[in-house]
Amino acid sequence: MIPKEKELKLIKTYMYICDVYESSLKFYCQRFSNNNHPIFTDQELLTVYLFCGAYQQYFKIKDIHTFTKEYLLSWFPDLPSYQTFNYRLNLMPEAISELVRQLIHSFKPQDCDSMKSLVDSMPIITCAGKNKVGKVATEITSKGYCSTKNMYYFGIKLHAVAFRRKGTIPFPEMLILSAADENDSTVFKRECVGNLNNREIYADKIYSDIPFYKETKEYKKLELFTPVKAIKGESPEITKREKAARDLFSTAVSKVRQPIESLFNWLNEKTNIQRAMKVRSTSGLLVHTMGKIAIALITLIFN
């Protein structure tokens, strides 16, 4: 048994999942086998996963299955074995990614500033420390360097473009996964710039590309602001003369951009998304990453 308040949250989560499943999710988890209508439905599977993560703080699949078996069996009498539960969940990375897109597009807060976006990335670590070769999800992972943590790691990156919100954490507009060794600026220009117009973008120095964004400013009204990078070959006299103005500008940009770091910190605090050391497959890594994002969004939106 669970408290009445959580029963209502469970029902609310299930009803939402059923609505989204009928409109879009079912197209991402269709089956063409004899077991195309399992007794324990995909809607129930997603509800259990999201509810236990968002409201019970269980993130390990084993813990989620155990809690459901002990406390939610009256709600989900057809709960399968742990092995089947885990197998079924790992078949749903595309459905969970679509769920994240639906949550982002359907529940955009009214206080989002549509003219200002913040951009950054965070590492999702499958192995770190002394490991020299990554052996998990090698199709999508690689070795990268995290300057914030001053460490090399194997894994992927989560890139975020988020709407600025005054006085609180930004709300994500786009979320992209890439290999850890891909340059942040390259991923942003390839995956995001084409979908952005009439916008001010605030980002870190690594995104700086003056010739590229000079063009986007002209034909897309898309302007990038980053802290000032040192100019190679510039004379010391000019550097010294411009230092005060550049420092003030860099500080102003950093203040606007800082909340996206708070978004990543909040996401990691809520779900421990960065630690993916227990993952053993590509689909498992995708479920781990997008599933944790879905859990965090459910917590933010439905509370």
What do the predicted segments below correspond to?
Residues M1-N303:
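Short alpha-helical elements
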